[in-house]
């Protein structure tokens, strides 16, 4: 995970102080890219413990097209609670855009199903793109998409994914995002009978909140540990049939968690 630690160092060394929507203040850099070869291990940060249940359940929730926190809460995941309304709704956020992008004629587009089918039909396509950034729906979203567009690429029977993230909370959010999209790539490769390739993470505004700087320095003082391995249930043949118990992370031995406040 050296690429992630290099991001933290770059922000600490070169970041510019900026104001932000939350009023917390950040150190920020613009334009940064990381690359993770998924054959080398599952890219989970080891210099602090991540909450695996949240990562896995959130991705399954996205893939189900769900935009209410009830499923997450029933599985002990609270990462979206701060943005939900009194009914648990978040508006047309990620799951809605991924699975049911509204069309002008009243219909909808299932972008995930489409990209799976298109990979099977035309693996060399340069249109293997899924977008969560729908300007017509932004005002109705509890939180505008931070990780807003991703593209797949197939070469030598390896499936790679590149994510563009417009806004990247480097301490709390980015480790989750890396793991989530690495997991999505591996799950898609599994059902497509491909091997996982690279996960490429391209960041726009990459920032450390002012109240995360000390925690980032603490994390960088720790030694990295070997990456864990991902094991998926071989009996699952549809992306939409995965359940929590079908995803197993083996050999995850991180340093203790480092607490930091969420900027809302």
From Swiss-Prot:
Reactions catalysed = dUMP + (6R)-5,10-methylene-5,6,7,8-tetrahydrofolate = 7,8-dihydrofolate + dTMP
What does the record give as its pathway? Pyrimidine metabolism; dTTP biosynthesis
Location within or outside the cell: Cytoplasm
EC number, as in UniProt: 2.1.1.45
Q: Which positions are catalytic residues?
A: 146 (nucleophile)
Sorted alphabetically, the Gene Ontology cellular component annotations on this record are: cytosol
Q: Which domain of life is it from?
A: Bacteria
User: Pfam families from the xrefs?
Assistant: Thymidylat_synt
Annotated dUMP binding sites: 21, 126-127, 166-169, 177, 207-209
Keyword Transferase attributed: yes
Q: List GO BP terms, alphabetically.
A: dTMP biosynthetic process; dTTP biosynthetic process; methylation
Q: Which SUPFAM superfamilies does the UniProt record give?
A: Thymidylate synthase/dCMP hydroxymethylase
Q: What is this protein called?
A: Thymidylate synthase
Q: Which species is this UniProt entry from?
A: Methylobacterium nodulans (strain LMG 21967 / CNCM I-2342 / ORS 2060)
